[in-house]
């Protein structure tokens, strides 16, 4: 990271400064302030100063829905929003498909990349689960290679359950169905 920053003209005497919109809580976020401070410390170690604009969850969502091109976002470099990743659209396509820019979608940064668009269209039109996995792997690889996101947590929702609990099915998303659950 330091090498890339130096190549871009940044270093100890000229630090890269970024402003990030974050929230204090909401929508199942684990510990957003503590986690963002951890990220801030790690970025500082390579010479990047992160400044946070802290807002409540609903304000952050409204800010996100306006997109990076909105006048209110002019001084911001990034936004930190937690998202469920229960399906291909929620996990990938809504963030990198150029058809999903605000106000229609969640492509806050207005990413416009023909390869992402091609892969997103392919994913939408692929019914075979094995083939879909291959396309999604390509989207994920490109997202990592292009560094369009800084992924910093995958909440696997650790929990402990009594052996007396019967019928519980661990959900694939944030939505828990307690209707089949019994105790005894």
Feature-to-residue mapping (PLM):
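Structural transition elements
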Residues: 1-7, 25-34
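Immediate post-signal peptide segment of exported/extracytoplasmic ligand-binding proteins
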Residues: 2-19
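Short regulatory "switch" loops immediately downstream of catalytic or recognition motifs
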Residues: 7, 22-24, 59-68
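Short, well-ordered beta-strand elements
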Residues: 14-26, 50-51, 77
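A mature extracytoplasmic/lumenal domain signature
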Residues: 22-24, 54-56, 154-156
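Detector for C-terminal structural segments
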Residues: 31-41, 45, 61, 65-184
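Short, well-structured beta-strand/strand-turn elements
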Residues: 44-60
